[in-house]
Amino acid sequence: MDQLREPLDVHTCGLPLALEVMGERWSFLLLRAAFNGLTHFEEFLGIGIARNILASRLAKLVEHGILVREPQADDRRKVSYRLTAKGVALLPAMLALRQWGERYGLGVPSNPVLVDRRDRRPIAPIAVHAQDGRVLDYADLLWVDGAELDPPAAGEAPDTGPTNTCC
């Protein structure tokens, strides 16, 4: 079976949508701030973003369901921005980018360090895993047409993970 190379159709790949939503610096920095517990407009300004850009990026993240905008219970004139389940699902991508930056950018580990709450040990590097849990290298991977995949066995749940095409 030959590796799938063409077409790189943007309609069969989740990457263009992800880039439409998150594909610029401020969106990722706002997401990082939200993961660090910031919830208010004034707090987000602390990352060095201009007010107009902040308002625009927050609106976009809310529009795409990454953040939810909620009035504060104690003062209905103020709002909070909180991560949704869709936003929390971006954590592995955020961590992979952070780890890449640590390795190839600054050359030093970031601080603070993200640890496992249970044993307070640093998390492992983000990796690509096979269905059976094996860590895969780039050389272990192959793009194939989704129609070539075997259907799930009887009683086995269908794979609801990423598509097997990309752009």
Set out the residue ranges of the language-model regions.
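N-terminal helix-turn-helix DNA-binding core of bacterial DNA-binding proteins
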Residues: 13-52
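Basic, amphipathic "hinge/linker" alpha-helix immediately C-terminal to the N-terminal HTH DNA-binding motif
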Residues: 23, 73-94
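Canonical helix-turn-helix DNA-binding module
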Residues: 45-72, 76
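Short histidine
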Residues: 1, 8-9, 27, 31, ...
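C-terminal regulatory/oligomerization modules of transcriptional regulators
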Residues: 95, 99-167
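N-terminal leader segment of winged-helix/HTH proteins
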Residues: 1-22, 155-167
